[in-house]
Structure formats: C-alpha cells, structure tokens
Amino acid sequence: MDFILNISMKMEVIFKTDLRSSSQVVFHAGSLYNWFSVEIINSGRIVTTAIKTLLSTVKYDIVKSAHIYAGQGYTEHQAQEEWNMILHVLFEEETESSASSESIHEKNDNETNECTSSFETLFEQEPSSEEPKDSKLYMLAQKTVQHIEQYGKAPDFNKVIRAHNFIQTIHGTPLKEEEKEVVRLMVIKLLKKK
C-alpha cells in the first residue's frame, strides 16, 4: 500500500507541473514509464484510479494546448499524433484518429478507463516461448526495447517518442497487423527478462 501511495504522489508531482510544452509531456510520460516499468513487469498489473484520471487529463491537455502552438507551426493534428505516439510506445495502446479538442473534452469522462486498459491487456497475453522465426521482427523488438529503456533519459525526447517508427515500419515498409502483434509480444518478453 505504501508503494501505491508513493507512486501516486510521484504522479501528482509529474502531472501538476507545466504541461504547456509537448516535449515536457513526453518527458513526464517517459518518467512515468521508468518509475512503473520494473514494478509492472514483476507484479503483472498495477492499475489505480489515479493513473486513469491523470492519463486522461494529460491526453486532453495535449490536444487542447495544440491551439496555442498552431501559430508556431504546431497543429492540433500534430498534438494528437504526439499523444498517439506516447500511447503506442509506452502502453502498447492502439493509436486513434485525430479528433478535435472539443470532442476529446466531451468524451473525456467516458474514456477514463481507456488509457489504462493497456496496462491490463499488456500482461494478460503471455508471449510465446518459441524462438523468433523472423530475425527482422526480433531486431525490431530489440530496437524498441532499447528506445523504451532510454525513454525519459535521452536529451531529445521528441526523437525518442518517434521510436514508434521502429514498430510501424521495416525499411520503409509498413508492418502487417499480425507482424505488429509478433513484435509487441517480443517486446513484452524482452522487457520481462530485464
């Protein structure tokens, strides 16, 4: 219980700080992953109301503040993409199509559980113990794990968040859905070995 309380307090500090910069949001998400990674992998599942609420808050903030950045060449669509990347890299969440900040705000209450559903599903499916048959996919998984481990530590967080491209493409060719799933399970298996 002390552990959960300690983590919740850390999260409050993270998300109550200035969220106006998308790069800061990326940093905060990276820090959150670093704090949770070992405990999540070892215990299998840690989901609290605080996580659900705070992640939903961050999601809305990214899209909402995009209007501020529009004048600097940072569009609302780019803000939504930033959030999709965060979910994809950190929580294996399916990316969603770009939506307006108004619709995000309207659906915010209904989507409280969405951000953490990935915490649960990530460990419900055990990766296969078989040796990887596709060395390209395995190398891709290893690259992804390397980026996840560096997340929150690298000086350029925007560059790190774009590590999702390692999951999306191989030599510029988009992965098939079944290939993405293979890589996802490989990543889980590699993380559990840490």
UniProtKB/Swiss-Prot annotation:
What is its subcellular localisation? Host cytoplasm; Host nucleus; Virion
Where primarily located?
host cell
Q: Name one GO cellular component term.
A: virion component
| UniProtKB keywords | Early protein, Host cytoplasm, Host nucleus, Host-virus interaction, Phosphoprotein, Virion
Posttranslational modification: Phosphorylated on serine residues in the 115 N-terminal amino acids.
Q: What induces it?
A: Expressed in the early phase of the viral replicative cycle.
Subunit structure, interactors included: Oligomer. Interacts with host HNRNPK.
Role noted for this protein: Modifies the subcellular distribution of heterogeneous nuclear ribonucleoprotein K (HNRNPK) and may contribute to modulate HNRNPK functions related to processing and export of mRNAs during ASFV infection. Necessary for virus internalization.
Family note? Belongs to the asfivirus phosphoprotein p30 family.
Per its record, how is this protein called by name?
A: Phosphoprotein p30
Q: Which organism is it from?
A: African swine fever virus (isolate Pig/Spain/E-75/1975)
Source organism lineage? Answer: Viruses, Varidnaviria, Bamfordvirae, Nucleocytoviricota, Pokkesviricetes
